[in-house]
Amino acid sequence: MASANPETAKPTPATVDMANPEELKKVFDQFDSNGDGKISVLELGGVFKAMGTSYTETELNRVLEEVDTDRDGYINLDEFSTLCRSSSSAAEIRDAFDLYDQDKNGLISASELHQVLNRLGMSCSVEDCTRMIGPVDADGDGNVNFEEFQKMMTSSSLLNSNGSAAPPST
């Protein structure tokens, strides 16, 4: 009887059973490449790569900042558990961003937003899209970068009960 190759059967944070502490620890150890009991920002990049999502160093530092509740600059097992619970939604947000970022330059312009919304059957003008971008555009460049998009998508005040974007208030 052949045993499964452990290299091809590794669980990922998105598939780990949160109710099984042993499985969680096994996945944590897989990403804690130097075995120091904590995941660095560099090792965190490997976690997201395993889930099929690549983040810039700035984005990884932001994730670390949000998950690192004890503020030691690393992710421990408890913090990793929290990250695993939220990681599928993070991957979904990245996928949604990529859908809107038509030219793949890392920014969503009013024109790109207009194209996608019209394709989805929503009637709006480029000017409407420019107004939608305004409150989200923290750096004032007229576009939405991933960080701004992620902040918008995770802000409960901008989402309605079914998880879709609420129209901007006037």
Swiss-Prot record:
Ca(2+) 3 binds at residues 101, 103, 105, 112. It comes from the Eukaryota. Ca(2+) 4 binds at residues 137, 139, 141, 143, 148. The modification N-acetylalanine is found at residue 2. Induction: By touch. Ca(2+) 1 binds at residues 32, 34, 36, 38, 43. GO terms for cellular component: cytosol; nucleus; plant-type vacuole. InterPro entries: EF-hand-dom_pair, EF_Hand_1_Ca_BS, EF_hand_dom, EF_hand_pair_protein_CML-like. The keyword Lyase does not apply. Residues 19-54, 55-85, 88-123, 136-159 form the EF-hand domain. Ca(2+) 2 binds at residues 68, 70, 72, 74, 79. GO terms for molecular function: calcium ion binding. Potential calcium sensor. This is Probable calcium-binding protein CML27. It comes from Arabidopsis thaliana (Mouse-ear cress). The lineage of its organism: Eukaryota, Viridiplantae, Streptophyta, Embryophyta, Tracheophyta. The gene is CML27.
